[in-house]
């Protein structure tokens, strides 16, 4: 259960920033969340960042807020971030590290030694849940995190993060770092307990770096081969659909989780199904993979999935 017992700090002078650096070095870990002016990491400018070294131990460091009387100088902020992120003895904890690392890379900051709570969540249940920070805070802590709309508004009048007051930004950003740290404490031990560490350590985490480099540098593709593969995959899906229709006895939408659930568990009476909170049959990847050895129809249905 999430409970904030004290107010978060806003760091606006270098002495306080230095104190946080010493604290982080002593503990050997820190949750970090960057705040920017764009969802596109390649285009984003760093407006500030938040840190957490424990539950309720979080702060926000403003850098480039408009009309702010006092905030940390960009040079001091970059020096701090570089020294922390490039120190392999300090574990950095992110939620969607790929985004933060792309932002930091623009300032020649590389990230060494890190965990990513979004990837940990994905490793624990790739098809069974969403993996946003807000969703996981609600799921594991019964906490409704402050939304961006609450501090920035929405629609055409929505403010960019640099236009938001430091006071409002501080509460929002520091909470994100605090939640990230709490999630890490909850989810990291489960990797070992559920024997999924190797999936995270050898597949998901390394792959994120590859995808980051692809987003940053682009990739070369053979357009002709790509088109041939697209046609091949499309034909395979159509063939599998026809097989399923023959087995079931009627056509249905293989892209509809609701219809697949009804076919598998209501019509074919396959055992082992589970329902979502809304009362519909669950047909996430975890459920379908579990049932693969039971139902040929299910196995073929799963092969048409694009996620």
Where in this protein do the model-derived segments appear?
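Conserved "right-hand" nucleotidyltransferase catalytic core of DNA-directed polymerases
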Residues: 3-65, 85, 112, 128, ...
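Amphipathic coiled-coil/heptad-repeat helices and related helical stalk/stem segments
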Residues: 13-17, 73-78, 97
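Acidic beta-strand-to-loop metal/phosphate-binding motif
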Residues: 31, 90-97
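Nucleic-acid-processing active sites and adjacent nucleic-acid-binding tracks
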Residues: 54-92
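Short active-site loop/helix that positions an aromatic residue
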Residues: 98-107, 122-124, 264-265
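Alpha-helical scaffold elements adjacent to nucleotide-binding pockets in ATP/GTP-utilizing enzyme cores
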Residues: 100-103, 132-136
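Conserved beta-strand -> loop -> alpha-helix junction used to position metal-binding or nucleic-acid-contacting
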Residues: 110-125
